[in-house]
């Protein structure tokens, strides 16, 4: 399932990977600051976009329009990659391997199957890796730069959290596609009128049955244009505010817009809608433990045996769990409280500790458990279900505000970077 992010690591990445091609003399397609976009980059992306469109049975615009979109995408990528190089942004091999493994998993493939699929489609695996690395650098630079421009006030979180709470039962997620008809900075009235006329003409075409994906590829200046403008699933509150109101009564299949923003005119298509329950209840546990840490004077095995003896003494009534914790436990945070860890959700604990704890019944004590901290005796004192809806709503409100503001800021930021860069297109 896709989220409403500007860039995603998914199978669509394959569409950004250059094809292996016969060795010919390469040419410069565009100069971007102190870098270049090569004809092979344009041709490779052109071929792979066509391949993906064919696999998705999606119509494409004419080659000249598609080439323009691809050129703009590669120019923007080059600008951001140059920024990343200046900032020293690097993606390790481990991060890259994990990202590729996630892509394979999202598409229900093993890595070997993914390699085979790439080869079948004529894609070189090393070239694919390099492209994914570039996409990760681009994403990190953009995310870091845009987030620095965003401020979220506590009052905003409180206000949106209340709205989310009031709308819990009627909450809806939307699957959207998007077309952006751009405006330059400080546009003239003629430029605004021309862009609005173009947007209205596209709305008319879409409402009369034209393929929205093809229209997006042909006309949209949004980063998702080459994916047919697909934004995927998300909550209405995660969208820019100017979109949310326009979509409040939208139905499946509706074409909404044009909507004016600071960067241009937006057109939205509602591909689908679905509801979702917002009530959130979690199970908390009240536990206590005794921790022994292996050291130069206590081996791992000695720590385990010592805990077995302590457990036997507790069971026989020779001592209590609390007294033993105060005497023996090496956890400075809980020893003086008789090992009491208070109420918490199990997922905050070390995995081995958590797994052992969740297997216990109320009042039951575990056998010695080994974790990354050492050896534990664990006793489950009680469990309870807690309504976390309010806290979850505030957390969700913060993330919605971040997504909303990020979407608005990212478009402005990218427009600024494009306007301030030296770009000379040498081929058409």
UniProtKB/Swiss-Prot annotation:
- Domain PpiC, first and last residues per copy: 171-272, 282-382
Pfam families registered for this protein in UniProt: Rotamase, Rotamase_3, SurA_N
> Which class of enzymes does this protein belong to?
isomerase
Give the top-rank taxon of the lineage listed in the UniProt record for this protein.
Bacteria
Q: Which reaction does it catalyse?
A: [protein]-peptidylproline (omega=180) = [protein]-peptidylproline (omega=0)
| Primary location recorded for the protein, binned into one broad class | periplasm
Spell out the SUPFAM superfamilies in the cross-references.
FKBP-like, Triger factor/SurA peptide-binding domain-like
**Where does it live in the cell?**
Periplasm
Question: Recorded E.C. number(s)?
Answer: 5.2.1.8
Its GO biological process annotations read:
chaperone-mediated protein folding; Gram-negative-bacterium-type cell outer membrane assembly; maintenance of stationary phase; maintenance of unfolded protein; protein folding; protein stabilization
Q: Which residues form the signal peptide?
A: 1-20
MF terms from GO for this chain are:
peptide binding; peptidyl-prolyl cis-trans isomerase activity; unfolded protein binding
Alphabetically ordered keywords of this record:
Chaperone, Isomerase, Periplasm, Repeat, Rotamase, Signal
* InterPro entries documented for this protein: OMP_Chaperone_SurA, PPIase_dom_sf, PPIase_PpiC, PPIase_PpiC_CS, PPIase_SurA, SurA_N, Trigger_fact/SurA_dom_sf
One Gene Ontology cellular component term attached to this UniProt record is: outer membrane-bounded periplasmic space
- By its UniProt entry, which PROSITE patterns does this protein fall under? PPIC_PPIASE_1, PPIC_PPIASE_2
Q: What is known of its domains?
A: The PPIase activity resides only in the second parvulin domain. The N-terminal region and the C-terminal tail are necessary and sufficient for the chaperone activity of SurA. The PPIase activity is dispensable for SurA function as a SurA protein with a deletion of the parvulin domains is almost completely functional in vivo. The N-terminal region and the C-terminal tail are also required for porin recognition.
Purpose of the protein: Chaperone involved in the correct folding and assembly of outer membrane proteins, such as OmpA, OmpF and LamB. Recognizes specific patterns of aromatic residues and the orientation of their side chains, which are found more frequently in integral outer membrane proteins. May act in both early periplasmic and late outer membrane-associated steps of protein maturation. Essential for the survival of E.coli in stationary phase. Required for pilus biogenesis.
Identify the PANTHER family for this entry.
Answer: CHAPERONE SURA
NCBIfam families (alphabetical) = PRK10770.1
- Quote the protein name from its UniProt record: Chaperone SurA
- Could you tell me which species this protein originates from? Escherichia coli (strain K12)
């Amino acid at each position: 399932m896709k989220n409403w992010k500007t860039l995603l690591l998914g199978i669509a990445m394959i569409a950004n990977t250059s094809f292996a091609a016969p060795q010919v003399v390469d040419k410069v397609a565009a100069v971007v600051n102190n870098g270049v976009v090569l004809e092979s980059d344009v041709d490779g992306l052109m071929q792979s976009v066509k391949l993906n469109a064919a696999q998705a049975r999606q119509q494409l615009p004419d080659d000249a329009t598609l080439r323009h979109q691809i050129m703009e995408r590669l120019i923007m990528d080059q600008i951001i990659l140059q920024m990343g190089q200046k900032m020293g942004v690097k993606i390790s091999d481990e991060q890259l391997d994990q990202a590729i493994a996630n892509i394979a998993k999202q598409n229900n493939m093993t890595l070997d199957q993914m390699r085979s699929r790439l080869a079948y489609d004529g894609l070189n695996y090393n070239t694919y890796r390099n492209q994914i690395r570039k996409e990760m650098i681009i994403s990190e630079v953009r995310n870091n730069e845009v987030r620095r421009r965003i401020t979220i006030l506590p009052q905003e979180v409180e206000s949106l959290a209340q709205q989310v709470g009031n709308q819990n039962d009627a909450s809806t997620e939307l699957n959207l596609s998007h077309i952006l008809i751009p405006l330059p900075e400080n546009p003239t009235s003629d430029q605004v009128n021309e862009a609005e006329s173009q947007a209205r003409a596209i709305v008319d075409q879409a409402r009369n049955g034209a393929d929205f994906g093809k229209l997006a590829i042909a006309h949209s200046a949004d980063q998702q244009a080459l994916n047919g403008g697909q934004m995927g699933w998300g909550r209405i509150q995660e969208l820019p505010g100017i979109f949310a109101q326009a979509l409040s009564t939208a139905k499946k299949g509706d074409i909404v817009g044009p909507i004016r923003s600071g960067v241009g005119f937006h057109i939205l298509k509602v591909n689908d809608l679905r509801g979702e329950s917002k009530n959130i209840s979690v199970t908390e546990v009240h536990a206590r433990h005794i921790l022994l840490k292996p050291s130069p004077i206590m081996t791992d095995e000695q720590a385990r045996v010592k805990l077995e003896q302590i457990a036997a003494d507790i069971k026989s009534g020779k001592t209590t769990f609390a007294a033993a914790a105060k005497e023996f436990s090496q956890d400075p945070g809980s020893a003086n409280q008789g090992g009491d860890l208070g109420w918490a959700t199990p997922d905050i604990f070390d995995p081995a500790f958590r797994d052992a704890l969740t297997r216990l019944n109320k009042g039951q004590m575990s056998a010695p458990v080994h974790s990354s901290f050492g050896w534990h005796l664990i006793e489950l004192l009680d469990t309870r279900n807690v309504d976390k809806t309010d806290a979850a709503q505030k957390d969700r409100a913060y993330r919605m505000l971040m997504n909303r503001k990020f979407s608005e800021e990212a478009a402005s930021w990218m427009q600024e970077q494009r306007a301030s860069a030296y770009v000379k297109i040498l081929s058409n």
